[in-house]
């Protein structure tokens, strides 16, 4: 008997199905087209209405096509047979993608970790205490606003927060929650100078502030504003120079903002599926590929459960308050305001060089969301930070199979030296 569907992802599903099938469709279309002298498909001959605006194969693609053509000629093999084999291979990949998505959506895994005690709450936000009564300086973790906070407490054996608690630290987590009516009007100043600072005020004495991804920028600004409450600062996979490695891609994301305005105005948020679509542009074919690989896993294996746990977190996103979406897309990605010294919170410029407290920068070596150069630019602005290059990716550093070696232990070592 077929198990019932349990989840909706990967989101947005139509986009990922189209991306997954696009290679096969392009191969079929290319095989039917007339050829140009250089061996590339004549898109304009097949569709005259394109009037020269059709895509052309890159020089690297043409070189590979010529290499394959020469190899086929040397082996006296017809190009048509090779094309047919490629199309069959791509169609099998499409079937594997569908199988992987179906296996994910029916997988029995469910997150069962119980939440730790809530010691403060405001609106939809909660402050969770993972080691109440533990000695030493509390470590307050600030996650991104666009994902659930659970990535730092994913599942047994994959929880940075529970690992630190087991090692004698007192980690706390600011769970931003779902933006309600009040939060939909929040801008970044409201989140930082308002809610985050009030969470700090709920704790006795100074804390170590630790921000992950977008949360690192929020933590940085709060630390600059409240050095009386922040003893040290840890920034994990935190961007600073949004134009460091691919300014065109950042500007392209910002250029989408006018088209998103009707949705922002109507809902007061940037919806989850819109956010997921923006992230899909970073690696359009990566998501279909990982679901093809998932189709080959034993559903009862630990690897399968870990895959599902991460995908559940990724697909259970949180909409972004419209004012924050405008600041992030237009100000951060479009204008590169942080790196230019133009990002302001409550009227004051955010400047890492103004911080005198100890700092720790964790820069993933393989990060497509926050390129290493973007995070390194932040380290270069801080006063003598401890820079740790994590041998992992953006999410893997926090909750992957190598997270303990890549981030958890180095962060713990730094905390113990404070």
Where are these regions (language model features)?
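Gly/Ala-rich beta-loop-alpha elbow adjacent to hydrolase catalytic centers
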Residues: 210-219
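Catalytic histidine-centered segment of alpha/beta-hydrolase-like enzymes
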Residues: 369-372, 392-406
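Short, surface-exposed "cap/lid" segments of acyl-processing enzymes
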Residues: 104-105, 112-180
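Alpha/beta-hydrolase active-site loop
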Residues: 185-202
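Short alpha-helix in the alpha/beta-hydrolase fold that links the catalytic acid
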Residues: 357, 371-380
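Catalytic histidine neighborhood in serine/cysteine hydrolases
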Residues: 379-396
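Alpha/beta-hydrolase-fold enzymes
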Residues: 2-73, 204-205, 218-323
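Short beta-strand/loop motif that positions the catalytic acidic residue
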Residues: 355, 361-363, 367
């Amino acid at each position: 008997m077929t198990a019932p569907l349990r989840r909706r992802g990967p989101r947005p599903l139509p986009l990922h199905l189209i991306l997954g099938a696009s290679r096969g469709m392009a191969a079929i279309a290319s095989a039917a087209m007339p050829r140009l002298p250089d061996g590339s498909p004549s898109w304009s001959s097949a569709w005259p209405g394109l009037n020269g605006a059709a895509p052309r194969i890159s020089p690297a693609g043409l070189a590979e096509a010529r290499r394959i053509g020469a190899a086929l000629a040397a082996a006296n093999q017809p190009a048509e047979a090779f094309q047919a084999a490629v199309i069959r291979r791509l169609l099998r990949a499409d079937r594997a993608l569908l199988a992987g998505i179906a296996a994910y959506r029916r997988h029995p895994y469910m997150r069962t970790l119980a939440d730790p005690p809530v010691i403060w709450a405001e609106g939809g936000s909660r402050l969770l205490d993972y080691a109440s009564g533990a000695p030493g300086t509390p470590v307050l973790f600030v996650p991104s606003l666009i994902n659930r906070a659970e990535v730092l407490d994913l599942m047994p054996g994959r929880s940075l927060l529970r690992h630190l608690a087991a090692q004698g630290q007192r980690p706390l987590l600011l769970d931003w929650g779902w933006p309600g009516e009040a939060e939909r009007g929040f801008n970044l100043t409201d989140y930082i100078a308002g809610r985050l600072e009030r969470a700090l005020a709920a704790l006795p004495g100074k804390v170590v502030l630790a921000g992950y991804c977008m949360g690192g920028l929020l933590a940085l600004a709060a630390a600059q504003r409240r050095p009386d409450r922040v003893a040290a600062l840890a920034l994990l996979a935190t961007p600073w120079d949004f134009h460091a490695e691919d300014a065109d891609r950042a500007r392209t994301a910002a250029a989408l903002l006018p088209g998103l305005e009707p949705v922002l105005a109507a809902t007061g948020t940037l919806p989850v599926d819109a956010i997921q679509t923006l992230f899909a542009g970073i690696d359009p074919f990566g998501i279909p590929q990982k679901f093809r690989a998932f189709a080959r896993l034993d559903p009862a294996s630990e690897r399968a459960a870990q895959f599902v746990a991460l995908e559940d977190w990724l697909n259970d996103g949180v909409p972004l308050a419209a004012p924050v979406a405008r600041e992030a897309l237009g100000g951060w990605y479009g204008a590169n305001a942080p790196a230019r010294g133009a990002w302001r919170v409550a009227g004051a410029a955010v400047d890492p060089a103004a911080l005198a407290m100890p700092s720790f920068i964790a820069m993933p070596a393989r990060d497509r969301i926050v390129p290493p150069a973007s995070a390194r630019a932040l380290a270069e602005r801080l006063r003598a930070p401890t820079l740790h290059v994590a041998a992992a990716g953006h999410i893997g550093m926090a909750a992957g199979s190598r997270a303990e070696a890549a981030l958890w232990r180095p962060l713990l070592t730094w905390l113990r030296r404070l």
